[in-house]
A protein has these predicted regions:
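Glycine/serine-rich phosphate-binding loop and adjoining beta1-alpha1 elements at the start
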Residues: 7-9, 85-174
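Conserved N-terminal Rossmann-fold NAD(P)-binding element of oxidoreductases
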Residues: 11, 177-178
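Short, Lys/Arg-enriched N-terminal segments with co-localized hydrophobic residues
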Residues: 1-5
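An N-terminal-biased, well-structured beta-alpha scaffold segment characteristic
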Residues: 6-111, 115
């Protein structure tokens, strides 16, 4: 073939601060159908119930050595900016996509730019109709709000939904989400 296969990769996030992942098996399947090769850290989605075998069955390459993933990939997608030791492995013309928080990580981003590494900070995407399908702020804020409501109901002293039973009706709880 005339073209090299582009490799997209993702590394384990710092699980103390980030439980989400960027590539679920469903997303990996989409990338592969587009002709991309996918590489992930071993146990990448384990904490969310995604086993390495689920990924391998789709054709995803699983690596124990994250530096090997970095060196051999074209695009790295992460939720947060990778750690300094991982960033130091990046080479010219690679691309990092994620929530890079460039205002707080200005020095790190500047260093990546000096190394000619492409950066796409999804948290800076304009909130316009054309970019709506990539608007991570709205989707994640929506998810956070949903989780906040569910978490708060654990402390609520009444039944939440309206319940109609043979014994009677319990009206729905009224809450204010701020």
């Amino acid at each position: 073939s005339l073209f090299e296969v582009m490799i997209i990769a993702s590394l384990l996030e710092d699980q103390k601060i980030e439980k989400r992942i960027t590539i679920t098996p469903e997303i990996a399947k989409k990338y592969i159908s587009l002709g991309l090769e996918v590489s992930l850290s071993s146990n990448y989605g384990e904490h969310l119930g995604f086993k390495d075998n689920q990924y391998k069955e789709l054709g995803v390459k699983i690596f124990k050595n994250e530096k090997e993933i970095i060196v051999n990939s074209d695009i790295i997608v992460q939720l947060g900016l990778p750690t300094d030791d991982k960033l130091s492995c990046l080479k010219e013309n690679q691309t990092v996509i994620g929530i890079l928080n460039p205002y707080s990580n200005k020095e790190k981003i500047d260093n990546l730019i000096k190394k000619k590494i492409n950066n796409f900070s999804l948290d800076l995407l304009p909130r316009i109709t054309r970019a709506q399908s990539m608007d991570i702020l709205s989707s994640q804020a929506n998810l956070a709000g949903y989780k906040a409501v569910i978490d708060s109901f654990a402390y609520f002293q009444k039944a939440i939904p309206m319940m109609m039973t043979a014994a009677g009706t319990i009206s729905a709880a009224k809450v204010l989400v701020v």
